Amino acid sequence: MFRPGGERDFQTSARRMGTSLLFQLSVHERELDLVFLDHSYAKPWNAHPDASSARPTRMLFVTPRRQPEASGDSDMSIDVETVTPTPMPLYDNQKARSVMNECDRHVLFARTVADGPPPPDDWEEHINKTGWSLAQNKLFNKVLKALQAERLGRLANDGACNEPVLRRIAVDKCARKVRHALSSVSWDIKLTHWLHNTLLESLSLAMLAAYLDVLQTLKSKVPSLIDRMLLSSSVKTGAAGAEALSLLLKRPWDPAVGVLSHNKPSKLPGSPLILIAPSGPTNPAFPTSRRMRFWQSQLSCLGKVIPINVHVGSGANVGITQCLEHMIGTVRGKVIEVHSHFPHKPIILVGWNVGSLMACHVSLMEYMTAVVCLGFPLQTISGPRGDVDDPLLDMKTPVLFVVGQNALQCSPENMEEFREKIRADNSLVVVGGADDSLRINSTKMKTEGLTQTMVDRCIQDEIVDFLTGVLTRSESHGHGSGETRDLDAEKKKPRRELPFDLDRSRPSSPAVRDMSSVCSSPTASPKPKTVGLSPAQKSSLITATQLLKTHMQRSGTVLTHKQAQAQFAAFMKHNMLVRKSIPPGSPSCLFVPVPSEQVEGLERDDMRVHLKRRQTPSPTPTKASKRAKIKVTIVSHGDAAGNTPGSTAQEVGLSGKPLGLTVGQTTVSGAKELSELLSAQRSGGLAEVSGALASSEGSFHSLQGSVISRSSSPVQAAGTAQAPSASSLLQGLSLSLQEINTKSPGVPSTTQVSGGKPQGQGQVLSSLSPGSGTLVRAVPMVSTGSGMTKTTAIHQLLTNGGLAKLANSLPGLAHVSSQSSGTSSTPRSKQRRPR
């Protein structure tokens, strides 16, 4: 057996790899496909267009198909000087040799305690065969021949690097021959007693040690027959000798017992329940074989093992069909019972030979996570499985098939064809040199340096790999179905990391949600929300906080907590006074510009982009810049006295979208007064603005009075005189903007706001660019006036007074004003170009 790197310590490798003995034992036998080497994108050699669910076959200890051809050169250089280093075995060599020589130590102890001298080396010549029958002679000769062959094997393998494995193979072969010899006499009690006593008295030390090894091996296979054969010898040897012999024969030795005991398989994810389906009716009188006990102990490391026992009556009328139906019903009932007790535990059904076939049929009836078929019987009396009417083709449970390369009931080629027809996800593991029960022959063991225990452990590693993938996928699907969220949909959604995107996509106030609903749905009608504190007051708090914070940061002063509370109290008091002074039916609109001298530290790139946008106005809304330069607060007046306040507020601090300002419809004189107020307060700072808000209450009321006195008849909104909300104002303003666009079809619209039926009348001054340094606070007024003066009022607002200057400073408003002045054919439209 060739392994690259002879000086590699396989014990260290085994400890590093943990439970993956498969990597160390079978990786050197994995055949490299030349197609994969040259074309990595190609499919496996066994891939089929219909086999979408069949995974590539895994090979364990399978001899490569392409053997190296013998060289035709007669002259070959043979290196006779270099000493090839001895490869280290995969097991603990020291511990393996210790358990290997255990029977020799017991023989030396037993013969030393005995009174008589040990028998000589030519012990066979000193045996008195007088009076032996023909059956006795034949039985003795067969057993002696097997023991002599085992003795020759010991001498031949003495000092070999893998002597424990070779010794184990020789002992198993000798035990098989002795068992055949005892079976030829039907395990007759008299003959077996006579043979055992004769061998104990006559055999030499080396031959007696070999005989004890054979008894130790047969005790694990046929314990009841060996116990009956040793019953007579216990009387002669005494209690101490019988007890020592029973302890010796209790456990057969194995070279890899140390590695397997220290490196056990790890638990599977989800803590599954492993049900072992029986291969036939079970009888409590016959204990489970040692190999099956080893498999159960190894599978118990993966999860909870539940063996299923099937008891069939001993009546003569029970046929094979009835027995199979009873077994399938028992297995199905056990699966249902386990499901009822553990509804959230994954269930894995494992079966050997016929048990694997029953497991597949039960998976068609009941839900389970996976099925493991060990030694699947593919051949039947009517031919191989996989016909059109075969119910196994409709399997949906993931299944793993483990078959032997030399199996008579299932060849790897036929298994490949069968797997291609199965709908369920399936995998195949082929064990080289194994039969239907996955037992490899002695020739394969000797050439590979393996034991059956090592092969079983490699098969278990393959099972662990398959079940880990299945359970991981089932857990992910289970979490996805159990929760309301959709992980795939969340992955497809764009992730917004910028704060202004979050503010823009998710409004934080009821007013913003109402406005967004109006803009998105033409037929939506926002409902007033009953809250303890009106949204206008909340927005006023937010606005005051940000204004004070910005002013303090720019002025370099430190605002204490008490000062902030005092500022809040003053602002709230002023706000309440303003709201009380305004009549319920006539809310007002006030523009308070903050001078652009206070907005410092702006990037030059933003200014260049702003200039370019002013030179080439685009009908589409401009993109948001990274830093906001405009803060607009829209505060709508509440409902009439005694009604639930439906006022809304919106503060745009970080959004770069086009902002709409609701302007009450006024006459020309009202627009002039408003522009005078704007120009009068343009020179003041932020502190002056707050002072002006408190000191100019009379001017505010005079402005309001002039606006109300010049207004015409009120708007009829659904037959009531309620004050319009922010959403209704937007609906009316959208209609006004549409009228502007219809009267001047050549003018591209700067914003589009969809609304339902008009509940209020007003205009929208849109596309406020963030590049401007003006901070505006807008308090909406009721839009009163007839529909005949909508367009003229907006034109006058845009062409006269300080509002036109404000529009010139903003690219969006400048675009609207230029278009409106163009329709009136005034020569000043050419002079008012954006600077």
From Swiss-Prot:
InterPro entries reported in the protein's UniProt record: AB_hydrolase_fold, KANL3/Tex30_Abhydrolase, KANSL3_1st, NSL3/Tex30
Main location: nucleus
One term under GO cellular component: NSL complex
UniProt region (Disordered), positions on chain: 474-537, 742-772, 813-835
Pfam families: Abhydrolase_11 (PF20408), KANSL3_1st (PF23154)
Composition-biased stretches (Basic and acidic residues): 474-506
Protein keywords: Chromatin regulator, Cytoplasm, Cytoskeleton, Microtubule, Mitochondrion, Nucleus
Keyword Nucleus: yes
One annotated GO biological process: regulation of mitochondrial transcription
Localisation per UniProt entry: Nucleus; Mitochondrion; Cytoplasm, Cytoskeleton, Spindle pole
Domain of life of the organism encoding this protein: Eukaryota
UniProt keyword annotation of Endoplasmic reticulum present: no
Ranges of compositional bias, category Low complexity: 817-828
Function: Non-catalytic component of the NSL histone acetyltransferase complex, a multiprotein complex that mediates histone H4 acetylation at 'Lys-5'- and 'Lys-8' (H4K5ac and H4K8ac) at transcription start sites and promotes transcription initiation. The NSL complex also acts as a regulator of gene expression in mitochondria. Within the NSL complex, KANSL3 is required to promote KAT8 association with mitochondrial DNA. Required for transcription of intraciliary transport genes in both ciliated and non-ciliated cells.
Self-association and partners: Component of the NSL complex.
Protein name, as recorded: KAT8 regulatory NSL complex subunit 3
Lineage: Eukaryota, Metazoa, Chordata, Craniata, Vertebrata
